[in-house]
Amino acid sequence: MAKPCLFSFSLCLLLLSSLCLAERPERYKECQLDRLNALEPDNRVESEGGVTETWNSNRPELRCAGVAFEKHTIQPQGLHLPSYTNYPQLIFIVEGEGALGISVPGCTETYEEAQQSQSSQDPRRRSSRSQSQEQEQQDSHQKIQYFREGDIIAIPPGIPYWTYNYGEQRLVAINLLDTTSLLNQLDPSPRRFYIAGNPEEEHPETQEQQGQQREQQQGAGGRRRGKHQQEQEEEGKNNVLSGFDPQFLTQAFNVDEEIINRLQNPDERLKQIVRVKRGLSIISPKSQEEEEEEEEEPRQRGQPERREERREEEKEEEEEEDEPRSRERYERQSRRRPGRQQGRQGEEQEEESESEQEGRGQQREWERTTRHRRAQGEEGEEEEEETSTRVRRQQGRGRGQEQGQEQGQEQEQEEEQQEGRRGRHGGRGRRSGQQREEEEEEQQQQQGRRKRQESRNGLEETICTARLLENIAKPSRADLYNPNAGRISSVNSLTLPILRWFQLSADYVNLYRNGIYAPHWNINANSVIFVTRGRGRVQVVNCQGNSVFNDDLRRGQLLVVPQNFVVAHQAGDEGFEFIAFKTNDLAATSPVKQVFRGIPAEVLANAFGLRLNQVSQLKYSGNQGPLVSPQSESEDHTLPKVA
């Protein structure tokens, strides 16, 4: 009986292991890349106010990194409609400037319109208006943040946000979508939930996967759902409100049916990005100050030109009349000034001499008084000491015998007290040691409670007040700098704490002409490079020592560099700027040059078969940092291209 049970149990284990191993090879093969490719956008959606471009998330490189990408180009006065995703996002502003608004549930609306004064209005109209109508006129919303070129923006999952281009130039932003984040409870397919508008599908590969799943569904319920969804797609309903029952929404939102009809059936032209014809007026300190300045300018410009001309003519006439008078006054004053100045100088000298004499007399009197007081004090002290010694001698003669007896008793009492104190001190020492241990344990427990409380803070201390922006393109922000090669600046959970929740970070690299970013690898993260400006040569080598990428990268292209793959960059004649997104909030790199410097010379000599002088040259020649400048611009120091 035991053998059949063991046999059946082993079969079950084999089946389970085969099922598990059937899924694992697919995940492992995603990063077994023999060749990397420079990726360009695969899908393009044109809207009234801009363009949205996406990369196919089924690309092997992107599946290895577990991310997806979007690129939004918003024209002036363009509004990217409110939307949210089920995974965190990192947005880098490549060009332009704009406004960002997020709507976090549970956070207060801190921006409010000022109450309009109703003193000038008719009291009959005021009485006819209800309080609800007055509240509708006064808008309030959550904080609006302004961004510009070089900013990194962190968007939490499930939080709706919108962007608006208030500048005169186009706004270009690249979005990293961390689809494999632990915060994503759905599958890693990229998807975006639009609250408004009639947006087109940004990731067709996701729609294709959903279509295949519908075909595999069985039963009448699945067929009915598929038909219902097909009807909705034919009607063009793609926002999250279009699928609800209109009557249910009217009751839930407590609004008219006309409003619900507008929400569920938007205009076909309202896609991802719409154009605001008259501009967007929102509550913000910046816009309010600009409006006040604009209101003051027309008032000043509205003054009649004739009045200004008359005032200028009157000023010129007054100046002409005042010129001869001012000259006569100046001549008279110049004639009188020498005598007055001499008289004033004489008076000042007399006053100074008198004040000096008075001061000297006061000093002499003060010295005399102090000497007299000191002499009196010394004599009094000597007399007091003599009297006190006489009294002590007389008292000591009469009390000598009594003190001898009392001293003996006091000595015995002191010995007994000392013995008791020793015993008490020993007990206290033991007790104090125990108390210290207990206090240390309590302190450790309190620290643990504080850490738990910090990690469990409410919305008011995390999302509502979290900092979402950080500019990493400023030259003063550089973490590594070589004036002949370029600069590198990083943003991570230490500089932007919200990234600790996202488990993401980024590096901004700006290489000057022919500047070199020496070979290095990412220790604990995958890296995705997006070129923002210029052109450069990039080489990537895998664990087998094979070159998986050796080509030029230009503006607008993506390149995935897997973890621990060695990579090197060199800029062209136009320079080379790129943003490198990392899948770790504290991503670290390891330059090969620093590794050589950390290894003893004997080890390197035996490992590479070098002489000691060659090893010292390998370790200590050139720059210490990863940014290297070529020796001369006349020679060609570009990275060689391997066929």
Curated annotation (Swiss-Prot):
Pfam families assigned: Cupin_1
Residue ranges with Basic residues bias: 422-433
Domain of life: Eukaryota
Cystine crosslinks: 31-64, 107-464
InterPro entries, per the entry: 11S_seedstore_CS (IPR022379), 11S_seedstore_pln (IPR006044), Cupin_1 (IPR006045), RmlC-like_jellyroll (IPR014710), RmlC_Cupin_sf (IPR011051), Seed_Storage-Functional (IPR050253)
Keywords in alphabetical order: Allergen, Disulfide bond, Seed storage protein, Signal, Storage protein
GO MF: nutrient reservoir activity
Domain Cupin type-1: start-end pairs: 36-261, 470-616
Signal peptide: 1-22
Alphabetized CDD domains for the sequence: cupin_11S_legumin_C, cupin_11S_legumin_N
Biased composition annotated in UniProt, kind: Acidic residues: 314-323
UniProt feature, compositional bias: Basic and acidic residues: 228-237, 298-313, 324-333, 357-369, 634-643
Stretches with biased composition (Low complexity): 207-218
UniProt-annotated stretches for the region Disordered: 110-142, 190-243, 285-458, 623-643
Keyword ATP-binding in annotation: no
Polar residues composition bias: residue spans: 623-632
Assembly and interaction partners: Hexamer; each subunit is composed of an acidic and a basic chain derived from a single precursor and linked by a disulfide bond. Component of globulins complexes which accumulate in seeds.
PANTHER family, sorted: GLYCININ G5, OS03G0336100 PROTEIN-RELATED
Family: Belongs to the 11S seed storage protein (globulins) family.
Protein's job: Sulfur-rich seed storage protein. This protein found in the seeds of many leguminous and non-leguminous plants is the source of sulfur-containing amino acids in seed meals.
Protein name as catalogued: Conglutin alpha 2
Species of origin: Lupinus angustifolius (Narrow-leaved blue lupine)
